[in-house]
UniProtKB/Swiss-Prot annotation:
Cofactor stoichiometry and binding remark: Binds 2 manganese ions per subunit.
Record function comment: Catalyzes the removal of a penultimate prolyl residue from the N-termini of peptides.
The protein's name in its UniProt record: Probable Xaa-Pro aminopeptidase BDCG_04966
Top-level taxonomic group: Eukaryota
Amino acid sequence: MISAIEPKNLLRPHSQPVVTTSTLQPDDECNIELRIEDTTVDKYPAKQHARRVAAEIHRDRGLVYLMGQKSTLYEDSDQERTFRQRRYFFYMSGVDEPDCDLTYDINADKLTLYVPDFDLKRTIWMGPTLGREEALQRFDIDEVKYQSSLDEDVKQWAQNQGRGSTLYLLHESQKPAEKVPNVFIDSKTLKHAMDTSRAIKDEHEIGLIRRANEVSAAAHIDVLRGIRKMSNERDIEASFLNTSVSLGAHKQAYHIIAASGSNAATLHYSKNNEPLKGRQFVCLDAGAEWNCYASDVTRTFPMTSQWPSAEAKHIYKLVEHMQESCIVRVKEGVRYLDLHILAHRSLIRGFLTLGIFKGGTLEEIQNSGASNLFFPHGLGHHIGLEVHDVSPESIMAQDNGDYSDNVLISPNNLSPCTTSSPTLKSGMVVTIEPGIYFSQIALDNAKPEQLKYVDLELVKTYMPVGGVRIEDDILVTKTGYENLTTAPKGDGMLEIIRQGDGSCNI
């Protein structure tokens, strides 16, 4: 680990279990130690975030108006939809409660939260909603008021500001219910300002992502411990969910992908219902969410502590090398595009060694786009309040264009990247998730220039491998990186399977 940064105020809610994993020794048990820390909760830095957003707006006056997520019912039903807070609203409030809104007066530096008015019937049935005093204690807010005063407050603000004042909205559809006279509605500036702010995580946010990764690591370890007893993909999903919830993470950052065998060649496989018998690998892409912040962790493993075939071992070790080669190069100023290209070049070299690619040089194969048949997605993405988090510009531009001299790829390559890709900055958290997939659909629909260098007969022997992906969440620092993901992989992963708590049912 290079230049590790320990957040000063790592957030851990009151009386929640903390996960620590012991270092594996050859004959030791892998233990998860659960302890309860009774510490004071630091408030989510909503006011700091509001000021950062205002600085990106580049105006000294105006009112930011953000709507939280409302309680809604499923269509033709009296059952409420599962609540998921709007992430832009959370970023400037820290409030994970329904039916709230906020305003931020840039000139007055005043952040106001609006909470639901008291509803006796709802309180009897569902319990009390967020109140004013509770909200002031829990959140980094200047003032808390009831929803019933919101529209009138906005009108009063506009009147006090005079003609030409600006109301900043995230979307045109989210303007106040009542028309506000003499106000300019700006629904374009705010999103870019918030995307720019959200791309760089502060210490508090890093602490939340770290905590989400701690829970995910424990859940991945429990799957490895029990995999020899499991007989279906759904057992894997159930185990991961059980551990996550028991450690206080009631929500997943995304739908769990528990793909065995050829299912792992489907990048976002979601059925999770097929038997494990006869499958070489499971690709488990699963990450818990903590206080609205995501983790995104992928591990690929066999059903026993042995590599199921020589082909499976070759592909796993190659993906492992692809990932490690990219991670060690992460630091501020590095262009993420170059890491993506490096991963493709590592794949090509590996396939040339294995004989899967033949009849061409590294550059010829690279320019043909043949590696895209086996590695069809980008190297990764930002992560934060969204598992695919926002930024002011795409981490890898998705269109063709010119390439500068220092790029490891030629202009006619078919990879979907251009030099408009930005450089990494300290405080960004990105995933590094190379993969190799043996997809019959991809091969059947390949272009002739891509297949020119592929030994299709040899590929047949690799098809049972399905797919291998390894993914970690990486914090960018000025001089290097910190890997926030602690879930075991490689030999440590196999050792946990060996020490698992059941005989093999596969």
